[in-house]
Amino acid sequence: MTPEAAYQNLLEFQRETAYLGSLGALAAWDQRTMIPRKGHGHRARQMAALARLLHERATDPRIGEWLEKVEGSSLVEDPLSDAAVNVRAWRRAYERARAIPERLAVELAQARSEGETAWEALRPRDDWQGFLPYLKRLFALAKEEAEILMAVGPDPLDPPYGELYDALLDGYEPGARARDLEPLFRELSSGLKGLLDRILGSGRRPDVGVLHRHYPKEAQRAFALELLQACGYDLEAGRLDPTAHPFEIAIGPGDVRITTRYYEDFFNAGIFGTLHEMGHALYEQGLPEAHWGTPRGEAASLGVHESQSRTWENLVGRSLGFWERFFPRAKEVFSSLADVRLEDFHFAVNAVEPSLIRVEADEVTYNLHILVRLELELALFRGELFLEDLPEAWREKYRAYLGVAPRDYKDGVMQDVHWSGGMFGYFPTYTLGNLYAAQFFAKAQEELGPLEPLFARGEFTPFLDWTRRKIHAEGSRFRPRALVERVTGSPPGAQAFLRYLEAKYGALYGF
């Protein structure tokens, strides 16, 4: 068999696998949005059966045979060619999948499905003790998986693993390591705490009461749809639905869905939650369709994905220019804003206040929420913390970093869906996304000129096109670190983000 024939076999086989994965994504969307209460048990078994089938395909020995034919051939001489990018990723996925026993793959799928279902039921009841057995099972399985992946090792192009946590982190942010994250987070938290002290000491406080007036759910949805369309989200290739925990999910080309949640007494959750998920969806809609079903057509990492969502939620969506364009329309849609001035509204949606809930945190304190989760996850995987002690450790870290502490579990250790789905190692990608976003945005302004005047005129296409060319079109051709450096000229770091916050919040809070 020639290398060309082997590569064609790989393309066809992996695309077929991607179609099956796409069905899994559709089932996952349904589970989080529309499924009847009594359907969860059957759905968990469906997901386990699909996981078994996907694992069988991922470990098919023909993959190894085809890869051997292609590796070392002229097809992959250029390490940045489409074929080389695909083959390298397929080899890594094949070795990782072969190392995971089918029994573990199926158990993980079922435990994740059951864990999310339990979390949805038990969190509103504040039932930590009821949730703990699910979390223990998920953690044990994740640790078993990490031990196996640790033995397999990383991609040869990436740094070696230093500890168990790295093996899971690497699945979300290729090349990221705990030993690099810890000093980066220390630098960031030092800058954030200094900025937070100046904000709280400024004496200025926005009237956030305007955000807690009455905002009917249907009006929020209608307004959110207008924003989506104006910013460039293709509503003929997606949809917006309500859910308990907002998410974006790509079913496939032409089907990238957004969910959000609305509170009639809080403006931010529904509107900025929608803009956040829209950022994710714009990335998915901008990936090269010709490469769908291959690594070349996938996002570079969750951190890069998060850079797109945080950009549209915050750097665009919370800018004064954005609301110069949309606040007059918001006043038409929401009568409760009739007496509110643009400047006061803009200050309110950028209010800084230490709080308990990560997804509702402001730009200044958000990454301190992530620091808490990173330190707790590291302690768990290093054997320095037991799950039974997690709630108290959570409270202690919130007191230390944010000066607040939860009185219950639902707004404390149970607030996020991630651990209920076994997603250990995911949280750091949120902060990395914020850092990447600031660097990308600064570079875009350097090349396109000031962006806020464009936003004020409702012109979002120049910026969206820039991100499509520089980031989306590249798929996973580059590792996250290399992509950031290629686009911005600098490696990922904290300083661009801290400069952005300093300029914005210095102006708002008068220092």
UniProtKB/Swiss-Prot annotation:
Q: Which GO terms describe its molecular function?
A: metallocarboxypeptidase activity; zinc ion binding
Q: What activates or inhibits this protein?
A: Inhibited by metal-chelating reagents. Strongly inhibited by 1 mM Zn(2+), slightly inhibited by 0.1 mM Zn(2+), not inhibited by 0.01 mM Zn(2+). Not inhibited by cobalt ions.
Residues of the active site are 277 (proton donor/acceptor)
Question: Any idea which UniProt keywords this protein has?
Answer: Carboxypeptidase, Cobalt, Hydrolase, Metal-binding, Metalloprotease, Protease, Zinc, Zymogen
Q: Which CDD domains match?
A: M32_Taq
State the span of motif (HPF).
245-247
Temperature-dependence annotation: Optimum temperature is 80 degrees Celsius.
Quaternary state and interactors: Monomer.
Organism field: Thermus aquaticus
Record EC number: 3.4.17.19
Locus of motif HEXXH: 276-280
- Motif I/NRXXA/SD, per the record, lies over 357-362
InterPro entries documented for this protein: Peptidase_M32_Taq (IPR001333)
Which positions does the motif DXRXT occupy? 255-259
The protein's annotated catalytic reaction(s) are: Release of a C-terminal amino acid with broad specificity, except for -Pro
Q: How does activity depend on pH?
A: Optimum pH is 8.0.
Q: Where is this motif: HES/GQ?
A: 305-308
The UniProt entry, under Gene3D superfamilies, shows: 1.10.1370.30
- The identity of this protein, by name, is Thermostable carboxypeptidase 1
Effect listed in the UniProt record for changing residue 332 to Q? No effect on enzyme activity. Slightly reduces zinc binding
What result follows from mutating residue 280 to R/Y? Reduces enzyme activity. Impairs zinc binding
Q: Where in the numbering of this chain does the Peptidase M32 domain appear?
A: 3-506
Tell me how the cofactor is bound: Binds 1 zinc ion per subunit. Can also utilize cobalt ions, but contains bound zinc when purified after heterologous expression in E.coli.
Family note:
Belongs to the peptidase M32 family.
Q: Name one Pfam family in it.
A: Peptidase_M32
